Amino acid sequence: MTPDEEHSIICHLDKLLEERSMSLVDLSHHVGISVANLSILKNNRARAVRFTTLTALCRVLDCTPGDIFTYKDEGKDS
């Protein structure tokens, strides 16, 4: 397996938005990021995240980066 296949970062925006009764469009307005880019992030297709984006998400969602993202090492036995 390549390093990209052995692990992944999982985005939990869906769960956080649901818990806050907030839509992706609402979040987009609050953080100043397009719905398209938030959708890429939400669907685990983002290759990188800027610290300014992460800071804005944490501020608006009142959470930490660890609430938004978790690391899953798919190469290890669970």
Question: How would you describe each model-predicted region?
Answer:
Residues 17, 28, 58:
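The alpha-helix within a helix-turn-helix
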Residues 21-40:
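Short alpha-helical DNA-recognition segment
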Residues 37-40, 53, 67:
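Residue-level recognition of specific faces of alpha-helices
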Residues 1-22:
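A short, Lys/Arg-rich alpha-helix, primarily the initiator
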Residues 2-3, 20, 40, 69-78:
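Short, charged recognition helix plus adjacent turn
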Residues 45-56:
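Short, basic-rich loop-to-helix N-cap that marks the start of a DNA-contacting helix
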Residues 14, 25, 55:
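Residues within the helices of the helix-turn-helix
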